[in-house]
Amino acid sequence: MKWLKRLTVIVGTFYRYRLAGLCASLMGSGWICALLKMMPQSSKLKNEPPAVRLRLALESLGPIFIKFGQVLSTRPDLIPHDYAVELAKLQDKVPPFDARLSREQIEKSLGQSIEKLYAEFETEPIASASIAQVHKARLHSGERVAVKVLRPNLLPLIEQDLSLMRFGAAWVERLFSDGRRLKPLEVVAEFDKYLHDELDLMREAANAGQLGRNFHNSNMLIVPKVFYDYCTSDVLTIEWMDGTPVADIAKLKADGIDLHKLADYGVEIFFTQVFRDGFFHADMHPGNILVAADNRYIALDFGIVGTLTDYDKRYLAINFLAFFNRDYRRVATAHIESGWVPADTRAEELEAAVRAVCEPVFNKPISQISFGLVLMRLFEVSRRFNVEIQPQLVLLQKTLLNIEGLGRQLDPDLDLWKTAKPFLVKWMNGQVGPKALWRNLKNEAPDWAQIIPSLPRKISALIDENRQQEMRDAYIHLVKVQQRQSLWLAVIAVVLLLILLLK
């Protein structure tokens, strides 16, 4: 009955932070919403804005709900802007767990004692969060490493909270008129995947390895080496990196770091990941970035990454180029062509809505325009038009906001458009023309070589399948007709019988 106890805690928090009225206002109208507004509410925090009360409630419910709020903050297509801003303030910081448990977890996962695994191992963790904590160590070969270890017995607690979230999301969709638009089950499913990805440290090791290969010998970014022999799904051993936290501007200046070049590097690294690699570090907040003495960035924490298809890249390139040319008609048609917009959407209405939210942004000097803000405004319009925004693009928008904020902290005069435009134009030019056509033909040739010989057989099978389906449909239709006829015959027989009896 642990789930019942936990549910009681959640409902109590719901009352204590006056969230009944908030839910009613977010969910639209209907008798359920009216009932929620009539519920008695705690007098506590009555003067605080609803978004603040929601953040405080999630903080009080613990690490899993804090992470849920962080994920929700990246969905401006689903929640109002002020809620997204407030939930972004949630901090995932918890006290470290017992060092003895940490040692036991490492030894159990790697199958050897700490002494055999590491020449030195610092018992006191250097960082701690809700999912894992990090210890400093040294391998017997001499390399200094960071050892990340998952909190023990975490999975049952996560599954319990996720089950309750799924239960609540299902009822929200059933009971509230606006429930489907908010897509609660989709949000919880996305959060479920996000959490389970973070719980697999072998996946994080693979992410770090991929990013390291993409930026091998880069003059802009250092990615720590992964020691795969010391990694499992519960333990990650990665190269220890020395550097200055990127947010420590005073120290960077004192060390003679070129802040202007560093800001440009950040933007260039981001767009290289997006348009060259289609694979990007999606958690690039200042806490995960150091700066080396040679003016290069050092990336940390690879638990969250995003991947982009050529279709996603095309969507981004078309929209950014159209935005900065103020071609809002092209933005609208790009969304309709994507198939993410309801079929009955009128391009003129979408164009007018995009113009209304974006024109004020583009009234500023181009060096002051925020790419991340442009995407956020676009997602806000999407919410009104029920556009299906892809999760990887939401991750990208959050990452872009982080990169922009960081870049302008280093260099207030940073011109993102100047750095980004060559990437966009180069990528778009690479998608059209004879060279692009020849490249695509070469890429597709092996598939066509396999498909063409079997094409007649597959076409024949498809025709047969269609015929069989037509026969099945005809049979079902015939059965339904016979059932209706039988029903009417039975009704007529009953009516005739009643007439005879009444005589």
UniProtKB/Swiss-Prot annotation:
Its EC number is 2.7.-.-. Keywords: ATP-binding, Cell inner membrane, Cell membrane, Kinase, Membrane, Nucleotide-binding, Transferase, Transmembrane, Transmembrane helix, Ubiquinone biosynthesis. It is found in: Cell inner membrane. The chain crosses the membrane at residues 13-35, 485-502. Pathway: Cofactor biosynthesis; ubiquinone biosynthesis [regulation]. ATP binds at residues 126-134, 148. The active site is at 283 (proton acceptor). It is a multi-pass membrane protein. It comes from the Bacteria. The keyword Kinase applies. CDD domains: UbiB. GO terms for molecular function: ATP binding; protein kinase activity. Pfam families: ABC1 (PF03109). Coiled coil: none annotated. It is an enzyme of class 2 (transferase). Residues 120-491 form the Protein kinase domain. GO terms for cellular component: plasma membrane. InterPro entries: ABC1_dom (IPR004147), Kinase-like_dom_sf (IPR011009), Prot_kinase_dom (IPR000719), UbiB (IPR010232), UbiB_bact (IPR045308), UbiB_kinase (IPR050154). Its main location: membrane. GO terms for biological process: regulation of ubiquinone biosynthetic process; ubiquinone biosynthetic process. NCBIfam families: PRK04750.1, UbiB. Is probably a protein kinase regulator of UbiI activity which is involved in aerobic coenzyme Q (ubiquinone) biosynthesis. Belongs to the ABC1 family. UbiB subfamily. This is Probable protein kinase UbiB. The gene is ubiB.
